[in-house]
């Protein structure tokens, strides 16, 4: 592929000098000659402070906001191309989309506190079963017919639009992506042409960033009110009371909706679920027609994730019957109610990414119908993150599991014992809770407790393969550790 070259006008900007740029970057250390350097406001310092370094490295133009322009006023040559806009993050995202120029023709996005990764993965899997080339983008990276590792659930807009362009150029026609509240608030999804968007649920998380439920919901709702075209479809899970109201609001605004849930008033609703040790059988209806399908997935909540994905795929143009026929072939996302090991006595171990109070309660409650005996849960909370959810996680766990072990998650720069104490504080009156700091030891102890018919759910880290302690990432995989513990205790090693 030849050099990509676009004028500022072609990127949607009006500048006093309509120069051409050959790249877009937000990092002055990565500037190449001919780049557009986007000087964004930061938490501690404005990116405009580094604009002169970017120019010295060869930047052909600067994109910034009024505050950035004020920083540059005394240093910048008045003839140098500069674009000043009030919402610089949104402008950057749209410019990145225009610069890279293409994306899979069918894109959907899903937001919500929990379930985003599973829904995006299920969309991709359904499309693949329908013999369509597809990817999913989110917490577990870019997966499917074109792959790429990611460091954020919703990547920065330059990375995102580069990924979408490369995927499209490789033949990918369909894409499903997670839309995190951070990504939405920071305008990273602007420029993605959506056919449909889904809202799974809304509970407490990320209040360290958004500060209030109102701000958190406003970030989530941006996906529909700002990014979703009016001719596209919103898929809303109305089992969540707040989302039931929100669905009505969107309908009044003129949006096309597919509502899902367990209420027969929904377009797509679950009427019955039967659980067994390896999955569930689902009875559901869509617009007057009833279906019975097998899901080889653990956890009742996965049924709603599957139907959310099915609705998004239907909303983006696929035949409902063909979509529903694929459901028995779906597999779980790494780290989402993922099978880890089985003891010789038949007791099973699963791993889940649940790391919020609601997710912990949901995961344990969903695992319960698959367990004949005691349900043991391991929980922990991450350091340098929302502290208010820690005692709530402890309370949620002791109220839903038969025994709980509190251990370290990713303590980061916090004192691990202090984090555990905050989790334990939510269950001070409970007798079914134990504290074991070392995560490997906690898993070993929990596996040792398992009797015939019992089940162990290890929550918090899911697909992660490292534990963040201080500034270091130490190798640690919950699935691998559970397998090792079972093998050791059952005399297989």
Language model: regions and residue ranges:
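N-terminal leader/targeting and accessory segments in enzymes
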Residues: 1-94, 98, 241, 269-274, ...
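Active-site beta-alpha connecting loops in nucleotide-dependent enzymes
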Residues: 40-45, 333, 360-361, 365-428, ...
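Short glycine-rich anion-binding loops that position phosphate/pyrophosphate groups of nucleotides
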Residues: 42-44, 68, 181-182, 204-205, ...
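Acidic, Mg2+-coordinating active-site environments of NTP-dependent enzymes
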Residues: 55, 70-76, 170, 185, ...
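Receiver (REC) domain switch/active-site residues of two-component response regulators
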Residues: 60, 195, 402
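Short acidic-hydrophobic, aromatic-tinged amphipathic segments that line or gate anion-handling sites
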Residues: 82-87, 434-437, 442
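Phosphate-binding loop of NTP-binding sites
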Residues: 91-238, 242-255, 370-371, 490
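Short, flexible loop segments at boundaries between secondary-structure elements
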Residues: 207, 474-493
């Amino acid at each position: 592929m030849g050099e990509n070259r676009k004028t500022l006008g072609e990127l949607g900007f009006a500048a006093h000098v309509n120069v051409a740029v050959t790249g877009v970057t937000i990092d002055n250390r990565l500037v190449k000659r001919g780049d557009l350097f986007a000087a964004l406001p930061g938490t501690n310092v404005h990116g405009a402070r580094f604009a002169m370094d970017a120019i010295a490295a060869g930047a052909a133009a600067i994109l910034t906001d009024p505050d950035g322009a004020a920083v540059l006023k005394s240093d910048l040559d008045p003839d140098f191309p500069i674009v000043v806009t009030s919402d610089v993050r949104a402008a950057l995202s749209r410019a990145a989309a225009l610069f890279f120029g293409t994306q899979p023709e069918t894109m959907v996005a899903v937001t919500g506190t929990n379930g985003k990764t599973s829904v995006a993965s299920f969309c991709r899997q359904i499309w693949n079963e329908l013999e369509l080339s597809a990817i999913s983008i989110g917490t577990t990276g870019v997966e499917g017919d074109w792959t790429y590792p990611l460091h954020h659930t919703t990547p920065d807009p330059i990375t995102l639009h580069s990924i979408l362009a490369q995927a499209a150029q490789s033949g990918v026609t369909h894409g499903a992506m997670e839309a995190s509240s951070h990504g939405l608030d920071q305008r990273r999804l602007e420029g993605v042409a959506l056919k449909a968007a889904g809202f799974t649920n809304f509970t407490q998380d990320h209040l360290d960033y958004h500060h209030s439920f109102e701000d958190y919901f406003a970030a989530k709702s941006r996906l529909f009110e700002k990014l979703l075209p009016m001719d596209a479809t919103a898929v809303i899970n109305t089992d969540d009371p707040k989302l039931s109201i929100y669905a009505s609001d969107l309908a009044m605004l003129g949006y096309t909706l597919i509502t899902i849930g367990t209420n027969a008033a929904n377009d797509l609703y679950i009427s019955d679920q039967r659980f067994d040790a390896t999955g569930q059988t689902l009875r559901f209806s869509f617009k007057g027609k009833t279906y019975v399908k097998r899901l080889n997935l653990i956890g009742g909540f996965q049924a709603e994730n599957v139907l959310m994905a099915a609705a998004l795929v239907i909303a983006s143009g696929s035949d409902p019957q063909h979509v529903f026929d694929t459901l028995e072939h779906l597999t779980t996302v790494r780290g989402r109610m993922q099978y880890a090991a089985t003891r010789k006595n038949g007791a099973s171990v699963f791993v889940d990414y649940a790391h919020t109070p609601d997710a912990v309660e949901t995961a344990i409650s969903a695992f319960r119908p698959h367990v004949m005996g005691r349900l043991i849960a391991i929980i922990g909370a991450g350091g340098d993150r929302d502290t208010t959810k820690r005692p709530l996680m402890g309370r949620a766990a002791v109220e839903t599991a038969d025994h709980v072990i509190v251990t370290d998650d990713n303590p980061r720069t916090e004192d691990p014992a202090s984090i555990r104490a905050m989790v334990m504080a939510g269950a001070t009156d409970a007798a079914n809770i134990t504290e074991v700091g070392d995560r490997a030891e906690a898993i070993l102890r929990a596996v040792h407790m398992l009797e015939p018919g019992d089940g162990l759910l290890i929550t918090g880290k899911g697909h992660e393969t490292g534990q963040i302690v201080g500034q270091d990432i130490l190798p640690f995989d919950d699935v691998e550790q559970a397998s090792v513990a079972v093998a050791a205790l059952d005399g297989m090693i």
